[in-house]
From Swiss-Prot:
It comes from Dictyostelium discoideum (Social amoeba). It holds the Pfam family GrpE. One of its GO terms (cellular component) is mitochondrion. This is GrpE protein homolog, mitochondrial. Gene3D superfamilies: 3.90.20.20, Head domain of nucleotide exchange factor GrpE. Belongs to the GrpE family. Transmembrane segments: none annotated. One of its GO terms (biological process) is protein import into mitochondrial matrix.
Length: 213
């Protein structure tokens, strides 16, 4: 009985023993598997690794973008400065010429006063004190208006005898006076006005045009 049991144990041990050749095969398979995994990982690492020269190209591109950004900032700053300057000029013009429409209305009053002073017969002013006082009162009123408007930059000009200038003169008729130069202002109907060198109203004039004999 005991001998039978021993034989069975020996038989079991013999059947479960791992042969050396099988162990070596398993170890080789494990080595090959690890090697294959490492080799498989190499292509991925190569793909993630930057190509030669790509870093320099990226730096150069960033420099170009930085320069472009600087230019845009300079352009923006220049535009803002221009807007600020134009706004300042517009404000100054508004202050200087804001009364232009108002002065045009006052010109009619001054024209009437000027016309009134010219209606007084000069030869009788010294003979008639009341007439002379009235003339002086009208003249003083005219001068007061001119002074007030002058304080605001409005100036009157009389172009008699000057060369005709279509920028400042408006011809309403022609003269033929051989004693005066051709194409000059021979008569002034209404004097002209400027506001800070800007023409408010041209002078209404008669131009001398000498006709050939």
């Amino acid at each position: 009985m005991n001998s039978l049991i021993r034989r069975g144990l020996v038989s079991i041990r013999t059947s479960t023993v791992i042969k050396p050749s099988s162990f070596g095969l398993m170890r080789n398979n494990r080595f090959y598997s690890t090697e294959n995994n490492q080799e498989a990982a190499k292509p991925e690492e190569t793909e993630n690794k930057p190509a030669p020269g790509s870093l320099e190209e990226t730096i150069e591109k960033l420099k170009e973008e930085l320069e472009e950004t600087k230019k845009q900032l300079l352009y923006t700053a220049a535009d803002r400065e221009n807007v600020r300057r134009f706004a300042k000029e517009d404000n100054e013009k508004a202050k200087k010429f804001g009364i232009q429409s108002f002065t045009k209305e006052l010109l009619e009053v001054v024209d009437q006063l000027e016309m009134a002073t010219n209606l007084f017969p000069k030869e009788k002013l010294d003979e008639n004190k009341e007439l002379k006082d009235l003339h002086e009162g009208v003249k003083m009123t005219e001068q007061l208006f001119l002074k007030i408007m002058g304080n605001q930059g409005l100036q009157r000009f009389n172009p008699i005898g000057e060369k005709f200038d279509f920028n400042n003169h408006h011809a309403i008729f022609e003269l033929n006076d051989p004693t005066k130069e051709n194409n000059t202002v021979g008569h002034v109907v209404k004097q002209g006005y400027k506001l800070h060198d800007r023409l408010v109203r041209p002078a209404m004039v008669g131009v001398n045009k000498i006709k050939p004999q």
